[in-house]
């Protein structure tokens, strides 16, 4: 018997998206499921739909099918068989019953603890050079009194009488498809299958207590504002013997009055006098690594940028060192002596006699 095209089975084109494939499968699986459909060949159609979905929902199988069809090198993709595969019947109807699907997570299975986040504020230099600090964080740890069981010492948990220890109960519901028996978590034991008859007086049956835990955190040199550090296994304790979560330390860096940060580079503005810019000078520039000498060539213009190699921040991942960029700004004096004013007037007079750039610009604007 020749197999129908899988896209034809689901009523889709070959360019259908994953979401369209999933929706088509759900619709047809509801229609042909043997527990619902009264059609004579419902079982065969359901298996056909399930097989088509199993192939088209898998990227690798779908690509192979698109290239070779049913006669491909791995013809016969599985499919058919039981009503397992992609979605179970309980999954299909979960939207009607509030999510009581078949693939429930075992509440007694080991689970990783929750991750925690801690905010820390550093000074500018601390972020550049790194720091080691001890932080106190509130965590939920297993109760020492009951060893995390939640039961009073000397007692133990009992099997839930309502679900006989299975953690699930059967509930009958009327649906558009008829009366359906739905399995859902037992409300008496929260799906654990166990009940605590006598609760621990310290943790009141939760098995956990709130504590403040001291943790040593190493801040790497070169960390920047907004970056975070992961401290493995320092989050909330795991559940049912599962591993602990992680701690994420989010770093905030205070602004500096003189320096600014751009990645691994440090930027600063250096005020110098008109005379230093015109005549040239050697000035002392502060860096996070100490003061350094910087030569200002004669005739330097305000806004000129100088590079101090290797005077920036270290790369937080260890890939070298940034630089410091010094932008010079002329400082115009606000108070002058009579002698200084006379010197400037004399200088200004000499400038007017020169065929300077300013005169050329002036003539250009006048159209001369």
UniProtKB/Swiss-Prot annotation:
Its cofactor is Zn(2+). InterPro entries: DnaJ, DnaJ_C, DnaJ_domain, DnaJ_domain_CS, HSP40/DnaJ_pept-bd, HSP_DnaJ_Cys-rich_dom, HSP_DnaJ_Cys-rich_dom_sf, J_dom_sf. One of its GO terms (biological process) is protein refolding. It holds the Pfam family DnaJ. A zinc finger (CR-type) spans 130-212. SUPFAM superfamilies: Chaperone J-domain, DnaJ/Hsp40 cysteine-rich domain, HSP40/DnaJ peptide-binding domain. Residues 5-69 form the J domain. It comes from the Bacteria. Zn(2+) 2 binds at residues 160, 163, 186, 189. GO terms for cellular component: cytoplasm. Keywords: Chaperone, Cytoplasm, DNA replication, Metal-binding, Repeat, Stress response, Zinc, Zinc-finger. GO terms for molecular function: ATP binding; heat shock protein binding; unfolded protein binding; zinc ion binding. The J domain is necessary and sufficient to stimulate DnaK ATPase activity. Zinc center 1 plays an important role in the autonomous, DnaK-independent chaperone activity of DnaJ. Zinc center 2 is essential for interaction with DnaK and for DnaJ activity. This is Chaperone protein DnaJ. It comes from Bacillus mycoides (strain KBAB4) (Bacillus weihenstephanensis).
